[in-house]
């Protein structure tokens, strides 16, 4: 399971303040703790913390790389911000570009730009593509699958290996009116997306979005994560500091026959996957 740690994001108060103060220690401590907690990638998102998003993402990347070699996930839907981050990143460790819709009303070719940047960054550069187009986030299963199919088709046309492609089916907050049917629609879409190519694209979600504003956030996230893994999900942007959630990842590996059973399977998983 590929876990993308979510906390280095300017939407969080401590990170926003660290960016404003240029406090490297806060960012570096977060990067170390997320790595130690089992992160495969560290998400790096300026959020609303700075007007100069290009300069800020470069500062974040350089700050993290001073003390940490965990691959980074550059998180912005602005191609110029991603390009700025790529100028200073060590892509040999691996990098994930997060993320592009299929297209936007203001930019029909945005997907092509992200594929080009991923290709230029090297063979260890992967790409997250959203099942979203110029009409926004789809509300039904069939449209999600159709957009995913077009994403896969366009990637293959450009010679982009589908093993480097992550399809994000976009989870919405379950608390939002009329959104409670969406988790079921997403699971049904996952059932089909995993068959769109051979090899199949990865599937990922921004897990914490599901429980935004809700009570029992960790419980909601854990249950849906287990359900989605059973449908083929192999990646999530998530809170690696939620140990109960990480235990779901470990147990899912066991039940999906990716780990040999032992009475100490959680300990074994942690020893292998945590820094």
Features from the language model and the residues they span:
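Hydrophobic faces of well-ordered beta-strands that scaffold small-molecule active sites
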Residues: 2-6, 40-44, 70-75, 93-99, ...
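Active-site mouth loops of central-metabolism enzymes
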Residues: 3-29, 53, 98-106, 136-142, ...
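Gly-rich Lys/Arg/Thr-decorated short loops/hinges at beta-loop-alpha junctions or inter-strand turns
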Residues: 7-16, 35-45, 128-135
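A non-catalytic, amphipathic alpha-helix used as a structural packing/dimerization or gating element
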Residues: 25-33, 37, 146-150
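Active-site cofactor/substrate anionic-group-binding motifs, chiefly glycine-
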Residues: 25-26, 57-104, 108
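Glycine-rich, proline-tolerant flexible connector loops at the mouths of alpha/beta enzymes
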Residues: 35-70, 171-179, 183
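Distinct, well-ordered alpha-helical segments
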Residues: 53-61, 82-89, 114-117, 142-144, ...
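Catalytic alpha/beta core domains of metabolic enzymes, predominantly
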Residues: 106-109, 113, 119-273
